[in-house]
A protein has these predicted regions:
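N-terminal low-complexity or simple alpha-helical regulatory segments
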Residues: 1-59
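Glycine- and acidic-residue-biased ligand/ion/polar-headgroup-sensing regions
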Residues: 40, 51, 59-80, 87-89, ...
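Beta-strand secondary-structure signal
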Residues: 44-46, 64-66, 113
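Alpha-helical bundle regulatory/interaction domains
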Residues: 76, 81-203, 227, 232-234, ...
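Solvent-exposed, amphipathic alpha-helical segments
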Residues: 156-167, 209-220, 264, 268
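Residue-level recognition of short, well-ordered coil/turn positions
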Residues: 169, 273-274
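Basic/polar phosphate-binding segments, predominantly the helix-turn-helix DNA-binding elements
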Residues: 185-192, 212, 216-260, 273
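Short, basic, alpha-helical segments at the C-terminal edge of helix-turn-helix-like DNA-binding modules
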Residues: 204-205, 257-266
Length: 274
């Protein structure tokens, strides 16, 4: 959980699971971390915040696997590359010689993180993995080919991950062990190139510009601006603006503004101001 930054406050620590609360000016979040096997941890992420100070510094022989169940996650690699995970996406990355941060543009993200520290895997665990034909080195090799590897989770992977949310609490520690081994077995045999998602990288300039556009239209939500007017005002091409906004927030800018207006109207109705 040190990967999540200084906003983490421990709620409850157990021998198998520890729960933590995150809070900063952008919102709140909760995580539940399970020590599954030596060197392997599984974390449930429930985020309702724009960021959680999750800055991951380079680490040797360390692998991270993320599965997005709901919402969106912005993944940053280096200083200039941004891309976005959506529901059903699975990402694999090595922190070998590189760092990245994660944030949540819509302040809504639910997903699972699996971390594997190869230096902590015992000889006994290696024998178990070998017996089950789980080749972690193959997964790690793919993660090192590029900064970030994202695939659209197939039906089997989605089934495994969804079951991690339906198991009864008293069975969860043992059940997670089984499901993690299943997931690693599938990933070790996965044809990454065939399942690779055609995701888009955005530059820091494009991402920062769209953040300003988002804040502007929210601040002036009662006014109407055309795509062309916004693009000209913020000095970005209309095509790049539309593409980046949809990747960041999940819907076109007009749809986002319409939904935002409806949310304001509903809030005013509840408060008796309309």
């Amino acid at each position: 959980v040190d990967l999540y930054g200084p906003s983490v406050k421990e709620k409850n620590e157990g021998s198998l699971c520890s729960s933590f609360h995150l809070e900063n000016e952008s919102g709140t979040g909760d995580i539940a971390a399970y020590s599954v096997f030596p060197g392997m941890e599984l974390v449930y992420n429930d985020m309702h915040m724009k960021y959680c100070n999750k800055t991951q510094n380079p680490r040797t022989n360390f692998l991270e696997i993320n599965y997005c169940r709901e919402g969106r996650s912005e993944c940053t690699f280096g200083e200039y590359s941004y891309c976005y995970m959506t529901a059903g996406d699975l990402s694999i990355c090595s922190l070998q010689g590189k760092s990245h941060t994660s944030s949540f543009p819509t302040s809504h993200y639910h997903g699972i993180t699996v971390t594997i520290d190869f230096a902590e895997i015992t000889e006994e665990m290696k024998q178990i993995l070998s017996l089950l034909s789980i080749d972690l080195n193959r997964i790690f090799a793919f993660s090192e080919k590029q900064d970030f590897y994202m695939v659209r989770a197939n039906e089997t992977i989605q089934h495994i991950c969804s079951e991690l949310y339906t198991v009864q609490d008293h069975l969860k520690p043992s059940y997670i062990k089984i499901k993690l081994l299943e997931l690693l077995l599938i990933l070790a045999e996965l044809n990454f190139d065939a399942g690779k998602k055609d995701y888009i990288y955005f530059s820091k300039a494009q991402r920062d510009c769209v953040l300003k556009i988002h804040d502007f239209v929210v601040e002036h939500i009662t006014e109407h601006y055309t795509i062309e007017e916004l693009a000209e005002r913020f000095e970005i091409s209309p095509t790049a603006m539309k593409k980046c906004f949809k990747e960041m927030y999940g819907v076109p800018i007009y749809t986002y503004c319409r939904t935002y207006r409806l949310q304001i109207a509903e809030k005013l109705l509840r408060e008796g101001q309309l």
